[in-house]
Structures are given as structure tokens and as C-alpha cells.
Design a protein with these regions (language model features):
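A general secondary-structure boundary signal
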Residues: 1-3, 35-37, 57-59, 64, ...
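Beta-strand/loop substructures that line and gate deep hydrophobic ligand-binding cavities in soluble
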Residues: 44-77
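Hydrophobic, Leu/Ile/Phe/Ala-enriched alpha-helical segments that form helix-helix packing faces
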Residues: 20-28, 83-90
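Terminal, regulation- and interaction-focused segments at domain boundaries
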Residues: 1-27
Length: 92
């Protein structure tokens, strides 16, 4: 599990899904699941689940892998890198 803290407060599922879709490109299917999570799929065997949590002065994303272990590691790593490098979450 990766934990990414960004200094921007109040990030929504829709914003997160939009940013991940742009950053990851067309090879990934990004969908909010309506339960405070966004699911990123590369194939039926590889997925990453991003949970959104608001904390004072920031938003925390927790990224978990889903699917077969060999495949989920790469997907989770790409999602984590995309979140860490996204300037959209750096400030309001």
C-alpha cells in the first residue's frame, strides 16, 4: 500500500478520476465507485484502488493493488507515480 499526501484539501472522486485518466492515458480504465474510491484497471488481471481521505490541511490518497500479484504491482506503481507527479493537487 502506498500513501500519498497532497497539500490540496477537498479533492473529489471526479477530480481524481479525471487527473488519473489524463496522466495514465488510454490504456487504463479509471472509474469512481461512489464509495470514496477510484478504481484503475489496466486489464481484468490488474487493478489499483485509490481511497480518498481528507485530513486537516491536506488530502491523503491510499493506493492498494487488486488482481494477480504479478500484474497489480506495475499498475499500483504507475498510479502512485501519477499521483505524486500531478501538479493539479499541489495547491488550490
Amino acid at each position: 500500500m502506498a500513501r500519498i499526501r497532497v497539500p490540496r484539501k477537498g479533492v473529489t472522486q471526479a477530480e481524481l478520476a479525471d487527473v488519473l485518466s489524463r496522466r495514465l492515458g488510454g490504456g487504463y480504465q479509471v472509474e469512481p465507485d461512489g464509495d470514496g474510491r477510484v478504481v484503475v484497471r489496466r486489464s481484468p488481471l490488474a487493478a489499483a484502488v485509490v481511497r480518498i481521505r481528507d485530513v486537516p490541511g491536506a488530502t491523503v490518497f491510499r493506493v492498494h493493488g487488486g488482481g494477480l500479484p504479478l500484474y497489480r504491482i506495475g499498475t499500483t506503481r504507475r498510479v502512485t507515480d501519477a499521483l505524486r507527479r500531478s501538479p493539479e493537487f499541489r495547491s488550490v
